[in-house]
Amino acid sequence: MDRVSSLPDELLCHILSFLTTKETALTSLLSKREIIPLIKSVVFPTLIYASFLVQLVSKLVKLKIGSGIDLCWWTESIFLPMLKTLVLDSVEFCVARFEILFPACPALEELEMANIKVLDSDATVSSASLKTLKIDSSVGSGSFSFDTPNLVYLGYSDFVAEDYPLANFQNLFEARINLVVTKDQIERARAPNNGWLEDDEDDIALRLGIRKSS
């Protein structure tokens, strides 16, 4: 007997909140009732369950992807219109896949990226709805741009990028910046007649268009 199908939505949502992503996926297969749209928050520990659920969940509000997942599986067919919070932890992606992620999340307000590996040279965070952005220890070899006109909070702890071509922070209220300069960047900065400035937090703040408080 399928008892899951007879449960009220509120009770079923409460029960699902205690299950792992794997258990939720298995429950959806065993039940005659479509329970995937009831899920509000999901953590994807492995790629197999990520690709399975992301294509089905249209009402997802919070999503966390981690554990070394390669985001190259993300396709233009994925659309998460209600997603408010996205956490990317220890994932890899190419720039082409990363850039189609934002149009797929038109309501995204909070983005956290930790231990990210960018496979291509340049990357851009572009979102008109984004209000909170936290970046911690991403790995890339090129420039990093911000096209986030409604961003209110920026937390940026990382190595200095080669360049910041675009820094759209029209409504930024608070920024916490903690950056590390590589040995190669220091050597180039110290070279005679070199126009590449030695980066520090003040310099990066100016390049990003952020006025630091005294």
UniProtKB/Swiss-Prot annotation:
Domain F-box per the UniProt entry, residue ranges: 1-47
Pfam families: F-box (PF00646), LRR_At5g56370 (PF24758)
UniProt-listed InterPro entries: F-box-like_dom_sf (IPR036047), F-box_dom (IPR001810), FBL60-like (IPR055294), LRR_FXL15/At3g58940/PEG3-like (IPR055411)
Name of the protein in question: Putative F-box protein At3g58910
